[in-house]
Amino acid sequence: MTSPAAAGNGLFKFLRPKLRPQSTDIQAAAGWGVAAVTGALWVIQPWDFLRKTFIEKQEEEK
C-alpha cells in the first residue's frame, strides 16, 4: 500500500522536480481562490437574490 502523499506525487511525475507544485503553492492558490470568491461576493452582493431563492419559501399561487 502506498501513502496518499506518495500517490499524489504521481500526478506531476511528468514535470521536472523543480517545476512540480509544492504544498505551499497549492495552499497559496486555495487562499487566492477564497479571496477571489469573497471579493466577487462583496462586489456583486447578491444577498436579496440568495434570500429569496434559498431561504424564503415562495407562496404557491392558485
UniProtKB/Swiss-Prot annotation:
Membrane-spanning ranges: 26-44
Mitochondrial matrix side: 2-25
S-S bonds: none
Residues exposed to the Mitochondrial intermembrane side: 45-62
Location within or outside the cell: Mitochondrion inner membrane
Membrane topology term: Single-pass membrane protein
Keywords: Electron transport, Membrane, Mitochondrion, Mitochondrion inner membrane, Respiratory chain, Transmembrane, Transmembrane helix, Transport
Keyword presence, Protein transport: no
CC annotations in GO: mitochondrial inner membrane
Family, per entry: Belongs to the UQCR11/QCR10 family.
Subunit comment: Component of the ubiquinol-cytochrome c oxidoreductase (cytochrome b-c1 complex, complex III, CIII), a multisubunit enzyme composed of 3 respiratory subunits cytochrome b, cytochrome c1 and Rieske protein, 2 core protein subunits, and additional low-molecular weight protein subunits. The complex exists as an obligatory dimer and forms supercomplexes (SCs) in the inner mitochondrial membrane with cytochrome c oxidase (complex IV, CIV).
Purpose of the protein: Component of the ubiquinol-cytochrome c oxidoreductase, a multisubunit transmembrane complex that is part of the mitochondrial electron transport chain which drives oxidative phosphorylation.
Name recorded for this polypeptide: Ubiquinol-cytochrome c reductase complex 6.7 kDa protein
Species this chain originates from: Solanum tuberosum
